[in-house]
C-alpha cells in the first residue's frame, strides 16, 4: 500500500514549532548583527560557517582585524550576555581554527572573538573581545 499524496514520508523530519521560531529568530538576529557591523565599517566574510567543531555566526574583517562574532538573541541584553557559555566558546575557537586553515590569506590578521547581543526594541550591543582563545 502506498502513501497518499501529501502524506509524510517515513524519513521526513518535521521541526517543532518552537525550533522553527528559534531558527527564524536566530537568522533575524544574525542579519541585524551583520547590518550593524557593516555600518561600523566591517566587511562580512562569512555567515553561519559550520564545522565539526561548531558554528561561527559571523566572520567579519575591518582593516587587519578578523572578528569571529557569536550572535545571541534573548528577551533582554543581560540575558543574551550570559548565553555564551565556556563550552560554546571552545567550540567557536575550534571552528575559527578551521576557518583560518581554509582561509590562509587571513592567518596574519589580528584575531578577536566578539559577541553581538540582540534584544527586541534595543540597539545591538557589540562586545569587543568577549572571550579569547586562552579561556
Swiss-Prot record:
GO molecular function: nucleic acid binding
Family: Belongs to the UPF0102 family.
Species of provenance: Nitrobacter hamburgensis (strain DSM 10229 / NCIMB 13809 / X14)
Cysteine pairings via disulfide bonds: none
HAMAP family per the UniProt record, alphabetical: UPF0102
Pfam short name (any one): UPF0102
Cited NCBIfam families: PRK12497.1-5, YraN family protein
SUPFAM superfamilies linked to this entry: Restriction endonuclease-like (SSF52980)
Name the UniProt record assigns to this protein: UPF0102 protein Nham_0146
Domain of life the protein comes from: Bacteria
Amino acid at each position: 500500500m502506498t502513501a497518499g499524496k501529501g502524506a509524510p514520508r517515513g524519513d521526513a523530519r518535521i521541526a517543532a514549532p518552537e525550533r522553527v521560531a528559534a531558527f527564524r529568530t536566530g537568522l533575524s538576529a544574525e542579519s541585524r548583527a551583520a547590518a550593524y557591523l557593516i555600518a561600523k565599517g566591517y566587511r562580512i566574510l562569512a555567515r553561519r560557517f559550520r564545522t565539526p567543531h561548531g558554528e561561527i555566526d559571523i566572520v567579519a574583517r575591518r582593516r587587519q582585524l578578523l572578528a569571529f562574532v557569536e550572535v545571541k538573541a534573548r528577551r533582554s541584553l543581560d540575558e543574551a550576555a550570559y548565553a555564551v557559555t565556556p563550552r560554546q566558546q571552545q567550540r567557536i575557537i575550534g571552528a575559527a581554527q578551521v576557518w583560518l586553515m581554509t582561509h590562509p590569506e587571513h592567518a596574519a590578521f589580528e584575531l578577536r572573538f566578539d559577541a553581538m547581543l540582540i534584544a527586541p526594541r534595543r540597539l545591538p550591543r557589540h562586545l569587543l573581545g568577549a572571550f579569547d582563545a586562552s579561556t
